[in-house]
Amino acid sequence: MLVWLAEYLHQYQSVFNVFSYLTVRAILALFTALLLSLWIGPKVIRRLQILKFGQEIRNDGPDSHLSKKGTPTMGGIMILFAIGVSTLLWANLANPYVWFCLFVLFGYGAVGFVDDYRKITRKNTAGLVARWKYFWLSVIALISAFGMYAIGKDTDATRLVVPFFKDVMPQLGLFYIVLAYFVIVGTGNAVNLTDGLDGLAIMPTVFVAAAFALIAWATGNIEWSKYLYIPYIKHTSELVIFCTAIVGAGLGFLWFNTYPAQLFMGDVGSLALGGVLGTIAVLVRQEFLLVIMGGVFVVETLSVILQVGSYKLRNGKRIFRMAPIHHHYELKGWPEPRVIIRFWIISLMLVLLGLITLKLR
């Protein structure tokens, strides 16, 4: 929004041209989202406490989690607010990719909001009925996938980028929609499953978003895209603003979510952040890279799938003491901060590994 104002004022004062630079707007988007989160955080916590919107705890979980009961949840509202305001202020709103991300962010956030609200009002961890939850997540993902395909049809924007192979970029055609659907829905649920300890999900999200900011910039820059042998997609450069807004909002939320947490993001935050990371991965054509950089999310999801499969196929036998896998380590006796920090370290290493693969082609 402010890009248009800066372009107008540039006619009268050249100094306003600085706001047209992508790097300047990206940094300002980060700090805007960060400061907004820090500003509204205490207000959100107080309001949630007044409304008695507290976290419900599973009875079969680690005993250490019982003390978390009643901690304000649905803090993802402040993350979405900070990202939304920052993006609307600093991104070029004529860019369709920005709107796809905002649509998924708030669409998935709305589904998560209903899920959280039902958990709170019904005083259990069941939430929204699974079939309806996945129905609405699927509708939002498919609308986005069809829209993205319509814009990028038969261009480099619908090619499949395979790590390590610079000449392997097949045109996906309609399969682009199928891939986009599974990436968006899958990532949304993966981040949701990871969000089980204080700060566990938000920091890997920040790492991945920061990496995608660099990738979006390179993909939207014709010289760098040629240098890295990745498709040049002109609309992706504005996703840098969206990614840095995620980083800022995420760090602001972590201020209140670090152990012991004063606030949980809830499904309204985890589903929204996961869904939008999946959307960004599709838009910059780096779905495989998301699997690498978001390895913590992948492992958490696989641990649940394997646990459920083992329980059903092996007459109640479990692979892990509890799934997702972060609870397994808690039940082994690891203190919660140790689990969190080690998962952060692994996440950072995987993000760096993912970035390195861009050059190893």
UniProtKB/Swiss-Prot annotation:
It is a multi-pass membrane protein. GO terms for molecular function: metal ion binding; phospho-N-acetylmuramoyl-pentapeptide-transferase activity; UDP-N-acetylmuramoyl-L-alanyl-D-glutamyl-meso-2,6-diaminopimelyl-D-alanyl-D-alanine:undecaprenyl-phosphate transferase activity. The keyword Magnesium applies. It is found in: Cell inner membrane. Its EC number is 2.7.8.13. Belongs to the glycosyltransferase 4 family. MraY subfamily. NCBIfam families: mraY (TIGR00445). This is Phospho-N-acetylmuramoyl-pentapeptide-transferase. It comes from Histophilus somni (strain 2336) (Haemophilus somnus). The lineage of its organism: Bacteria, Pseudomonadati, Pseudomonadota, Gammaproteobacteria, Pasteurellales. The gene is mraY.
